[in-house]
Amino acid sequence: MKYYLNNPLSNNGIKKKLPEDCKIIDATTIDYNDFFDNLKPEDEVVMVGGDGTLNHLVNHYDCSKLKNNVYLYANGSGDDFLHDIGESKDKEVLINKYLVNLPIVHVNGKEVKYLNNMSFGLDGYCCEEADRIKAKTPKKKINYSGIAIKGLLFKFKPKHAWINVDGKEYEFDNVWLAPTMHGRYVGGGMKMAPGQDRFSDTLTLVIYTSKSKIKSLMLFPSIFKGEHVKNTDVVKQFTGKKISVRFDKPCAVQIDGDTVLDVIEYSTELK
């Protein structure tokens, strides 16, 4: 039997066309432990959703125990995971090997696994604003790039940051972004860490720092192709297994697109 675990909230509620007469289950209503532990060996599972759907899976089930093939039939608004592995939204993609050995982030007393990225600063602000828009207009398509540009110019204030990478300490002023990347992509197609490999034994921290809003704005479009890293006066990269970032003032963090508000510090580790 092939089960389709559909997240009705993904892609702003826009439904994905599924095969006729297939077994569809609402992924938001089930107990993942009961569901996966009671599958027959020949059963298969298709996750229908986006990055948030996969994040929910890895945080509600120990995927190292999986005995069945699990596929992604992508239906997200950003699909950073799909961008990173170079697959299409038009087919079911086997994903078992991507669901284990994941980094863990500690933030505001929570411990969360993530598949793609977690970001402090402007990106977290964008997710916070997107949540507000969704609350007011649930079916409205979110323009994350537009939110980011408006935030950069008018709303978001850069922070002072202290970072620690495998015991080495650094300090930066005027920090706009401080994502720690397990994959290469963030924000629905921005190639934030072009050299990151999700199968490596390290994470990549990207620090985007500049006193000038205009310079920051002019460089911003180059993130989509990963060319921003050539501007080493603005973009700093660090690789390590254990990374922490502390800001001087609280702001939002996003973890695979899910927002955590009022964060001063996060730490993340890939064991």
Residue ranges, per PLM feature:
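ATP/NTP phosphate-donor binding region
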Residues: 1-48, 52-67, 87
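Catalytic core of DAGKc-family lipid kinases
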Residues: 3-5, 9-11, 63-176
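Short glycine-/acidic-enriched loop or helix-start segments at secondary-structure transitions
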Residues: 14-15, 56-59, 81-84, 125, ...
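Flexible, charged surface loops at secondary-structure boundaries
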Residues: 37-43, 65-66, 170-173, 237-239, ...
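Glycine-rich beta-alpha junction loops
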Residues: 118-122, 181-184, 209-210
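Gly/Ser/Thr-rich active-site loops/lids in small-molecule metabolic enzymes
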Residues: 135-144, 188, 194-214
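ATP/nucleoside-binding phosphotransfer catalytic cores, i.e., glycine-rich phosphate-binding loops
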Residues: 167, 197-200, 207-271
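Glycine-rich phosphate/pyrophosphate-binding beta-alpha loops
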Residues: 177-192
